[in-house]
């Protein structure tokens, strides 16, 4: 079985926090939970995988060095970070216009199909979305270019149980569609992982 992510002794030191010798793999066809309380280093680990945070150690994605082959790798990754998204003054339709130029594999039909499935309006500004609607839009945007790997940082935090379960079902379906796909999901809600 191939690994879509491999970490070996990844470390990052801050003034008041240290991530020390983190090692794990995310095999193809699997959803792997990165579990820990707030402040445990989950986001730092994810940002190290994505090369947003420069860390020591070895990170391989699809068997390739995450620093040397970053642009090739990122084309195949869908990411949902809590602190990253486009302007609240955009609509879903405008996000489509931007993303189709960002990703070579952007699938317009899939994006609008997901918006319909999630019951998201295409012409309403994001600032007027609920937190659950915003998360669904982030997920639709992350999935619409058919990535091989999803990396999700606390995607269900602060959502009501019904929306949370709906989003978790989306992740399960994403994996079931293609056995070479993987998800790395950080959470402090262990029942989320039990659900999927």
Language model region names:
Residues 36-41, 55:
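Walker A (P-loop) phosphate-binding loop of ABC-type ATPase nucleotide-binding domains
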Residues 40, 161-163:
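Helix N-cap at the start of a conserved alpha-helix in ABC-type nucleotide-binding domains
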Residues 75, 81-138:
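ABC-family P-loop ATPase nucleotide-binding domains
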Residues 150-154, 159:
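Catalytic Walker B motif of ABC-type/P-loop ATPase nucleotide-binding domains
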